[in-house]
Amino acid sequence: AEIENNRLGINFRFQNSFAPGWLFQASGQTRAFWKDDYEYKANGNNFDAESRINELFVQRSFDQHSIKFGRQTVVWGETVGNSVLDVINHFEFRDFTIIDIEDARLNQWMVVWDYFGEESNWSSFINLYPEFNPAGVRGSPFFFEPTFNFTDYQRDGEVLVEVGTQWKKSFDLSDISFMAAYLYDNQMRFEDPLSGFGDAIGKKNDFILLGFSANRAIGRLLLNFDLAFSHDVLADSFNFPGTSALASPLNLKKDRIGTSFGFEWAIDNEQSVSLGIQAQQLIDEREGLLPGQQLVYEGVYGSWLVRYANNLLN
């Protein structure tokens, strides 16, 4: 696979306060893929384009309350782009390049209620139709040729719901938040079809998330910190048919502790630099493993992200 190198993108947003206390908002994006881009090659060396609607919601505000219904995202955590708490929205893994994280998050059908109190705020959500990470796009760095086709989760009339709430308090130069949620792993676990041919079988997993986040402003510097405890996450959710082996455990649930921290530094009114470091570890990671079995991630694992931004708009 190759990094994309020849594409054109357009993002758009529409917002209309059509009545007192009412707001309609929609956003979307269009991508065109030209010669030498991997999407162009994956399309048989032909021009290709795609479009999608991101946000599409109606908001009602009254007194100290705000209620939004429609396709939207809910973002938790202070560490921009690399937070252990930013797991509510499913993602489209496509490119290695640095993009706005909003381009990777996929919106879902939600009801979001916000309460703005005098000393603290509450925010709660209900995801009415939880979705899962789509399979990698053919030709992209995250794509591999699977033994069996990956399909969407077969709900068969099953009702899936995600819920969560957050309490936030602001001080003179800092904020703190506590949060709790019942979620489904964004990444499904896939199993071989029982017949040995056809489509892979997607398996879901639900878990509980408890979190804490804080930030502190010091002049032009903003320090941030996130902490997450996840109960009953899958130890290995990236075992795909044809890539896993007997040495890999199946359907093994674990508790996980994770933290992310970093800073954002405003160089001036147009330029900024940010750093985010993420680290996670499974609790009692060897418990439940058979002799010879091992996890894809053992010990402490994580990632880091550095960003430089220059806003050229006046």
Which residue stretches match the model-derived regions?
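Outer membrane beta-barrel
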Residues: Q15-S140
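Extracellular loop and loop/strand-boundary signature of outer-membrane beta-barrel proteins
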Residues: A1, Y40-N46, D95-I99, F148-Y153, ...
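Residues on the lipid-exposed face of transmembrane beta-strands in outer-membrane beta-barrel proteins
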Residues: I10-N16, E55-R60, V111-Y115, T165-K169, ...
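Residues that define the transmembrane beta-barrel architecture of outer-membrane proteins
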Residues: E2-L8, A49-N54, R105-W109, V159-V163, ...
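Transmembrane beta-strands of outer-membrane beta-barrel proteins
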Residues: P20, F24-A26, I67, W122-S124, ...
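Detector for outer-membrane/organellar transmembrane beta-barrel domains
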Residues: N215-N314
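Aromatic- and glycine-enriched pocket-lining scaffold segments that form the walls
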Residues: E102-D185
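Transmembrane beta-strands of outer-membrane beta-barrel pores
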Residues: A1, T30-W34, F62-Q64, T73-V75, ...
